[in-house]
Amino acid sequence: MILQIDENAEEIYFPDPHYGDEDGCFAVGGDLSIDRLLLAYSNGIFPWYSFRDQPEILWFCPMKRFVIFPDEIHVSHSMRTLLRKNRYSVGINEDFDAVIRACSKTNGRYEEEGAWLGENIIQAFTALHEQGFAASVEVWDNETGELVGGLYGVTIGKVFIGESMFSKVPSGSKIALIFLARYLQEHGGKMIDCQLETPHLKSMGGRYISYEEYMEIMNED
């Protein structure tokens, strides 16, 4: 059941996500304000646009969550070889705007190229970033200085919720994800929420957990 959010309500709220459809969609409407996004992500909820049949924001909260635990990240032999070559440098929050705009120009989790990541969404996540609730990882080519890969997402407590990634070179986004996992290990991060399963993420250690386990980790001190 997908319920309409009452935009005239005195307080920001979401319906109970347990009654969503099989894909996890349970609500429509609302906005991308910082307060609503923080309420959403702290409860395992994320926004999604479907321009084909629904111009409003769709809100998803799957009861099975595809995640990567930082200490379970799988680094293949070929990736280890690539990383040892020191061809790329990796940083965090060095150019959030460049990363999110690069993601908007690639086919991500939606079919419409770039359409899902319009200027309104870029502005919303940039606002989260400016408040310390969104972060980016950048992969730079050491020879050319070009940004060749990266990812961005929302940070809530010890959880990183991945939103999108891009790669202009083979394995560029994998390098970013490996760096993120190692960074979280060093700084007490507990989990990377991948949102959707892909062969790419599964090969790197992604697996499903229940929504209940997800929220237990989300609420850890």
Over which residues does each language-model region extend?
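N-acyltransferase acceptor-side catalytic subdomain
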Residues: M1-D221
